[in-house]
Amino acid sequence: MTNYYAEITGWGKCLPPAVLSNDDLSTFLDTSDEWIRTRTGIENRRISHVNTSDLATVAAKQALARAGITAQDIDLIIVATCSPDSLIPNIASMVQKNLEIEAAAAFDLNAACTGFVYGLETGTRLIQSGAYRHALIIGAERLSFYIDWAMRDTAVLFGDGAGAVVLSRTEEAVGLQNAKIGCDAQGRDILSVPKFGTSMDRFAADNGYWDFNFVGKEIFKRAVKGMGSAAAHVLAHAGMSKDDINVVIPHQANIRIIQTLCDLSGIDQSKAFVNIQKYGNTSAATVPIALCEAVEQGHIKAGDNILLAAFGAGLTWGAGLVKWGQRVEAISESDAALPECDKSALELLKNAIELCNARRDK
């Protein structure tokens, strides 16, 4: 029987143009650029003027062009997101519609910030079954929709964006070699939006104002433990040591978590690709955006061993070992772009900030 693998043949990203800086946040929160940078590593984040599916579509078009295939070649679409345009139907179907794909399997996957790693594992195994030839794996979020802009601890962390990869079936031993995903359910309440969905009071007067539970110290401890143990597992399973890893693509949640993960794993911090300073935490989109930029900037070379690691609400966690193929250059480029935005980030958030502050003052 033929052994199939799922090579990453295309990569793309989409970042909305409106930039919300730390200084912008200090105009309506008790914070400062220094306070945010020293605690998180974040300097800016993006605020979207369009829906999550629009971000996902642009990232997908870039990935398709770089893979040198057409949308009609895709027979599987997985969108990792916890901020979809709608609950019913899924937004993978919207991406499929936007790309004018006639027939493909399409579904959303919610593992919060670990979503892309879960999606990559799922897509890879489906391709290895022999049933699919080309898959789009997308991480896309519009987290600004959820944020309580009167709550400093979370308002400074998150941003909007999308990243995508194309997986293509091959007999060469490249792509995701193995992964370890899991969930620490005892910590599910320390990072959550608990009253969104059927648990909410549908007719309550304050619908639309969701509590965002965030217990930072406990999240830090559990995140490092979950990612660290998953990373150790995939290396042991592959018979590799830390020295065999060329590049680490970690979830971009907090610079201190990234540094601690590397230190505990014995991996030099210089091997970790970091772009949290530009985009903040884009949840399921952080890993594919970082992967895309690592390729674009020449950090990933042909044949590299790449360690992915992430954690998220649930508390989900996961790591994966990717063997890069021989091609690091795009076959072609796409001119896909979002519609123009004529507002600043603060202008886009004006009503949300006012309403969140009014609720806090009640």
Curated annotation (Swiss-Prot):
Entry's localization field: Cytoplasm
CDD domains for this protein: KAS_III
Protein EC: 2.3.1.180
Reaction it catalyzes: malonyl-[ACP] + acetyl-CoA + H(+) = 3-oxobutanoyl-[ACP] + CO2 + CoA
GO cellular component, one term: cytoplasm
Pathway the protein takes part in: Lipid metabolism; fatty acid biosynthesis
Keyword annotations: Acyltransferase, Cytoplasm, Fatty acid biosynthesis, Fatty acid metabolism, Lipid biosynthesis, Lipid metabolism, Multifunctional enzyme, Transferase
Main location: cytoplasm
Keyword check for ATP-binding: no
Active site per the UniProt annotation: C113, H251, N281
GO MF annotation list: 3-oxoacyl-[acyl-carrier-protein] synthase activity; beta-ketoacyl-acyl-carrier-protein synthase III activity
Any one GO biological process: fatty acid biosynthetic process
Segments of this protein annotated with the region ACP-binding: 252-256
Signal peptide start and end residues: none
HAMAP family the record matches: FabH
Cited function: Catalyzes the condensation reaction of fatty acid synthesis by the addition to an acyl acceptor of two carbons from malonyl-ACP. Catalyzes the first condensation reaction which initiates fatty acid synthesis and may therefore play a role in governing the total rate of fatty acid production. Possesses both acetoacetyl-ACP synthase and acetyl transacylase activities. Its substrate specificity determines the biosynthesis of branched-chain and/or straight-chain of fatty acids.
Annotated domain remarks: The last Arg residue of the ACP-binding site is essential for the weak association between ACP/AcpP and FabH.
Subunit comment: Homodimer.
UniProt similarity note: Belongs to the thiolase-like superfamily. FabH family.
The protein's name: Beta-ketoacyl-[acyl-carrier-protein] synthase III 2
Organism: Vibrio vulnificus (strain YJ016)
Organism lineage: Bacteria, Pseudomonadati, Pseudomonadota, Gammaproteobacteria, Vibrionales
